Amino acid sequence: MSNVRVSNGSPSLERMDARQAEHPKPSACRNLFGPVNHEELTRDLEKHCRDMEEASQRKWNFDFQNHKPLEGRYEWQEVERGSLPEFYYRPPRPPKSACKVLAQESQDVSGSRQAVPLIGSQANSEDRHLVDQMPDSSDNPAGLAEQCPGMRKRPAAEDSSSQNKRANRTEENVSDGSPNAGTVEQTPKKPGLRRQT
C-alpha cells in the first residue's frame, strides 16, 4: 500500500472522475476567437485573392488568368525557350513526402528494391543497359531516384549473418561438448585493468 494522502481541501478522486465524464472540457483553441463561420471565411479569402490578382494585373499589365499581355507601361514579347535559363522551364521537383512514398512503392513484397540506374560517373557498363530499357523517368518511380536523395541506389545487404554480430565466448564454454555451449556470451573486459586487492 502507498503512503499517499489526499487532503480534505481537494476533491476526492471519485468526484473528479464523475465530473470529467459529465462535462468534458471544450478545446481552448476552438473557442479562442469564437466559432468559425466557414462561409464568411471563404468569401473573404476569394475577395482577397481577387484583389491581389487585380493589383498584379495593374502593376504588370498582364492577365495572369488568360496568360495574355495587356496594354500599359510594360511591353511584353515572346522569347525562345532555349534562350532562357533552365530553371524557368524545367518541371518542379517532387515534394519530400513523394520521395518517401516512391521509396515504399519501389519495394516488392520480399523487401528488395527494383533496379535503379546510376547517373553520370557512378554508372558502370553493367548499369548502362538499364537506362536504355527505361521509357520515361516521369512514368517510372525509379527514374526519380536522382531527385529523391533519400532513396537507396542499391539494396541493403540481404545477409545479416553472425559475421557482423560477434559473440564473446569464453574458451571453456566453446570447448565444452554441451549443446548450449555456443549460446553463452560474456561481456568483454579490458586487459590490464584488474583490481588490486
UniProtKB/Swiss-Prot annotation:
One Gene Ontology CC term in the entry: nucleus
GO molecular function, one term: cyclin-dependent protein serine/threonine kinase inhibitor activity
InterPro entries the record matches: CDI_dom, CDI_dom_sf
Gene3D superfamilies found in the cross-reference section: p27
Signal peptide extent: none
GO BP terms: apoptotic process; autophagic cell death; cellular response to antibiotic; cellular response to lithium ion; epithelial cell apoptotic process; epithelial cell proliferation involved in prostate gland development; G1/S transition of mitotic cell cycle; heart development
Modified residues (Phosphoserine): S10
Post-translational modifications: Phosphorylated; phosphorylation occurs on serine, threonine and tyrosine residues. Phosphorylation on Ser-10 is the major site of phosphorylation in resting cells, takes place at the G(0)-G(1) phase and leads to protein stability. Phosphorylation on other sites is greatly enhanced by mitogens, growth factors, MYC and in certain cancer cell lines. The phosphorylated form found in the cytoplasm is inactivate. Phosphorylation on Thr-197 is required for interaction with 14-3-3 proteins. Phosphorylation on Thr-187, by CDK1 and CDK2 leads to protein ubiquitination and proteasomal degradation.
Residue ranges, compositional bias (Polar residues): 1-11, 104-113, 175-186
Entry superkingdom: Eukaryota
Motif Nuclear localization signal in this chain: 153-169
Residue ranges, annotated region (Interaction with CDK2): 51-91
Modified residues (Phosphothreonine): T170, T187, T197
Assembly, per entry: Forms a ternary complex composed of CCNE1, CDK2 and CDKN1B. Interacts directly with CCNE1; the interaction is inhibited by CDK2-dependent phosphorylation on Thr-187. Interacts with COPS5, subunit of the COP9 signalosome complex; the interaction leads to CDKN1B degradation. Interacts with NUP50; the interaction leads to nuclear import and degradation of phosphorylated CDKN1B. Interacts with CCND1 and SNX6.
Stated name of the protein: Cyclin-dependent kinase inhibitor 1B
Source organism (scientific name): Mus musculus (Mouse)
